[in-house]
From Swiss-Prot:
The gene is pncB. Pathway: Cofactor biosynthesis; NAD(+) biosynthesis; nicotinate D-ribonucleotide from nicotinate: step 1/1. Belongs to the NAPRTase family. It catalyses: nicotinate + 5-phospho-alpha-D-ribose 1-diphosphate + ATP + H2O = nicotinate beta-D-ribonucleotide + ADP + phosphate + diphosphate. This is Nicotinate phosphoribosyltransferase. Its EC number is 6.3.4.21. PANTHER family: NICOTINATE PHOSPHORIBOSYLTRANSFERASE.
Length: 402
């Protein structure tokens, strides 16, 4: 039986870009990732898919990169040849993943091992959990509803394409939906449909396998885990963001220049994002909190540094759909270039409640790490003492309880 994942390229580009930095700069780092489902309830307990998940992981850990896949990675200008040589030998090791269930029929997943292994499991496992869960709920009516919603999106993109002023900065969206997709075949169908409807708007996909297959641009730079790791590396905690950005610059020399801002919140990020970084990075990515407030803060920061914000890119990727993206573009288009990464709403809009699942880095080298998101519900750690200390160091207030 062919597994749900049948290519190691079937993941997000930023896994490769982050893995390359880890391999080159801190390859001995040890990490722990933990799974969490944020849904209050599910149609059936996730514990029910445990056996199938175990089998899928066994199959995943048999996969190797093919010569054709390695050739594609080598063609990306920011991927270095020694990294591709490493990937030729690469194979995920099953022993680093533990799967269990608890007395409430919840699924527990722990990935613990070298970061150069553990980091690469995340997207695969989330995509497998999603597909196994929704497979049991599939009916012809579900596919029909998904298709109806997809055609409505395609029609809306055609309208937007017709309304765009060619003299204004373009409205560009990308698929960021691998981790929470309905299944790979559906993700491909969605991208093909939207590309055909509005080729000038659909910029690419975060999924490397589909970017290669469809001949479109793979999109991505860094995730929270990259910055969080520096909370436990050999730098003062207060300086972890600067160290992470410096490390990125050292690796990519101006390429892949979009920085993620919400590991300890936008205000704390901007205190570290000085003139040097602001000139060097092409722009910023929003992933939590009010996107309008966030973008206005970014604009004020660039103004203060006397940088023309119209030369910079704001990328939005937090719970978007086409309408929210278009509204944000209208608001910011005169001040910034914009880009929009749309995830679940593209790849799993079938009428069911999607799974809100994550697999997050919680420890690095035996030390807790955390994210103080601009959205309180996205804060995740297994150590409340460290979280309080992080708040204190970066002067981030406790979120108000409703």
């Amino acid at each position: 039986m062919t597994g749900i994942i049948h290519s190691l390229l079937d993941t997000d580009l930023y896994k490769f870009t982050m893995l390359q930095v880890v391999l080159h700069q801190f390859p001995q780092t040890h990490s722990l990732y933990e799974f969490r489902c944020r849904n209050a309830s599910t149609v059936y307990p996730l514990a029910d898919i445990r056996e199938d998940l175990e089998a899928e992981l066994d199959a995943l850990c048999q996969l190797r990169f093919t010569h054709d896949e390695l050739g594609y990675l080598r063609s990306l200008r920011f991927i270095k040849s020694d990294f591709v040589d490493y990937l030729e030998l690469f194979q995920l090791q099953r022993r680093f993943v533990e799967i269990g269930t608890d007395d409430k029929d919840r699924l527990n997943i722990r990935i613990e091992g070298p970061m150069i292994q553990a980091m690469f499991f995340e997207i695969f496992i989330l995509a497998i959990v999603n597909e196994l869960y929704f497979r049991r709920l599939e009916t012809p009516a579900v596919i029909e509803e998904g298709e109806r919603r997809l055609q409505a999106k395609a029609a809306r993109l055609k309208e937007i394409a017709a309304a765009q002023n060619p003299d204004e900065p373009p409205f560009l969206i990308s698929d960021f939906g691998t981790r929470r997709r309905y299944k790979l075949a559906w993700q491909e169908h969605v991208i093909r449909t939207l590309l055909e409807a509005a080729p000038g708007i659909v910029r690419g996909t975060s999924n490397v396998f589909l970017a290669k297959k469809l001949g479109i641009t793979p999109i991505g730079t860094m995730a929270h885990e990259f910055l969080q790791a520096f909370q436990a590396l050999d730098v003062r905690l207060r300086n972890f963001q600067k160290a992470a950005l410096e490390s990125w610059v050292h690796e990519y020399r101006g390429d892949l220049g979009v920085a993620l801002t919400d590991v300890v919140g936008m205000d704390a990020f901007l205190r570290d994002f000085d003139l040097y970084f602001a000139k060097l990075f092409d722009g910023l990515r929003h992933d939590s909190g009010d996107p309008y407030v966030w973008g206005d803060k970014a604009y004020a920061h660039y103004q203060k540094l006397k940088i023309d914000s119209r030369t910079k890119m704001l990328t939005f990727s937090d719970g978007l759909d086409i309408e929210r993206s278009w509204a944000l573009h209208q608001y910011f288009k005169d001040r910034f270039k914009t880009g929009f990464g749309i995830g679940t709403n593209l790849t799993n809009d079938m009428g069911h409640t999607p799974l809100n699942i994550v697999l997050k880095l919680v420890e690095c080298n035996g030390q807790s790490v955390a994210k103080l998101s601009d959205s309180p519900g996205k804060t995740m750690t297994n150590n409340s003492t460290f979280l309080a200390y992080l708040r204190q160091v970066f002067d981030v207030p406790e979120p108000e309880t409703p």
